[in-house]
Amino acid sequence: MRTRSTISTPNGITWYYEQEGTGPDVVLVPDGLGECQMFDSSVSQIAAQGFRVTTFDMPGMSRSAKAPPETYTEVTAQKLASYVISVLDALDIKHATVWGCSSGASTVVALLLGYPDRIRNAMCHELPTKLLDHLSNTAVLEDEEISKILANVMLNDVSGGSEAWQAMGDEVHARLHKNYPVWARGYPRTIPPSAPVKDLEALRGKPLDWTVGAATPTESFFDNIVTATKAGVNIGLLPGMHFPYVSHPDVFAKYVVETTQKHL
């Protein structure tokens, strides 16, 4: 049975969270769009294999919209890691496996490096290290124009499966419509420079598994492959592109379970 509720943390964030199962903790950190419904099917599949799975909407996004502006502006990996630790504290999650894609990937690596006593292992997918002007420049547009542009980008360029993306439903897409401007103004200019992957020695030997999308153009995240290889971090592929938990939830859940089991 899944718990769906809210909880507040001392930093002023009221988090919407979901939790299912019993066993070792697995935490699924959303990408920059902040919407945990993307993990809906995978949560149950992972929990069924003997884990307690927790996920949440990110500060300022979707059902965690009640949050101080500083938690969703000039966002960095390190800030996000501190916010995630605050909700783990509130939920009494002391030691967890963490997954994250995009800004979530930066977050889980920052958690692994900054809070090693709290993290069993981390899985990161398509971690952004480069400024992309065509995304950063949307910040100056009106909200509606930002949402229109980014909805098209997500569906047609990076979803990895347009049918699965659309199938998330009207309520999810209505929340994403509101999240796109928050992301455009708070994430693209500050997340890539904060990527916690510059110190290769700091990554070496850490319980970290790295993936990119099998259908993502190689040049998009080639730097991920190079960095992981140089640091001796396991690098692999997941089907689809930027959102494997939406396009291929069964394969994603299996990957999370099997990777976590290696570290128990």
From Swiss-Prot:
EC category name: hydrolase
EC nos: 3.1.1.-
Reaction catalysed by this enzyme: zearalenone + H2O = hydrolyzed zearalenone + H(+)
GO BP field: response to toxic substance
pH dependence: Optimum pH is 9.5.
Domain AB hydrolase-1: 27-207
Active site: 102, 126, 242
Keyword Hydrolase: yes
Pfam families documented for this protein: Abhydrolase_1 (PF00561)
Residues that bind zearalenone: 32, 102-103, 183, 187, 220, 242
Effect ascribed to mutating residue 192 to S: Strongly reduces the catalytic activity
Keyword set, alphabetical order: Detoxification, Hydrolase
Family label: Belongs to the AB hydrolase superfamily. Hydrolase RutD family.
Subunit structure: Homodimer.
PANTHER family in the record: AB HYDROLASE-1 DOMAIN-CONTAINING PROTEIN, HYDROLASE, ALPHA/BETA FOLD FAMILY PROTEIN
Protein name: Zearalenone hydrolase
Organism: Bionectria ochroleuca
